A protein has these predicted regions:
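Flexible internal linker/loop segments at domain or repeat junctions
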Residues: 76-83
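Extracytoplasmic Gram-positive cell-surface binding/anchoring modules and repeats
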Residues: 1-2
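A cross-family detector of function-defining hotspots
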Residues: 5-71, 83, 87-150, 156-160
């Protein structure tokens, strides 16, 4: 976690007050929130995989979630859609993944159709593997807007 703080991630001051808190072995921290702009935010969680207690600042990144509160919709007017698109594009200046933040479900599946799970209720696609050490899994979960199939949320989780 300290690397992200040193790198300039603008965690909330009230949450940074917790970085000295103890994290027991095999436990995760609470969720840290970062507002990228009025429409885009991120969340982070950290894990202690050592055999001893450590502080939250020493814990390893185990979860990242990027999400847009709003994405363009077919029933929104053009100016509203332009505003949402601009907020997402603006967030891409501060947050980089190996795919565009304007990714559509079709584009994702064209590049990799080996998903481990499809969820029609959430219009999501997952690429996950089971952890070899802990109960749970690691991987990517992409959630798309049901109307436009535009990416609205990505979460990346890691367990050894």
């Amino acid at each position: 976690m300290q690397d992200l703080i040193d790198g300039g991630i603008p965690f909330k001051e009230s949450e940074l007050n917790n970085i000295g808190n103890n994290v027991n072995k095999n436990y995760e921290t609470g969720t840290y929130n970062v507002k990228i702009n009025d429409n885009v935010s991120m969340q982070f969680q950290f894990i202690n995989i050592t055999d001893s207690n450590i502080t939250e600042s020493e814990a390893l990144l185990s979860y990242v979630r990027w999400y847009a509160l709003h994405v363009p919709q077919s029933d929104y007017d053009e100016s509203r859609n332009a505003e949402f698109s601009e907020n997402i594009s603006s967030a891409a200046k501060d947050v980089c993944f190996s795919f565009p933040l304007t990714l559509t479900k079709e584009q994702l599946l064209e590049n990799n159709n080996n998903a481990t799970e499809f969820n029609d209720n959430f219009n999501s696609v997952e690429y996950k593997i089971d952890s070899e050490v802990y109960m749970g899994d690691s991987g990517y979960s992409f959630e798309f807007n049901k109307d436009t199939d535009q990416l609205k949320e990505i979460s990346i989780s890691w367990l050894p």
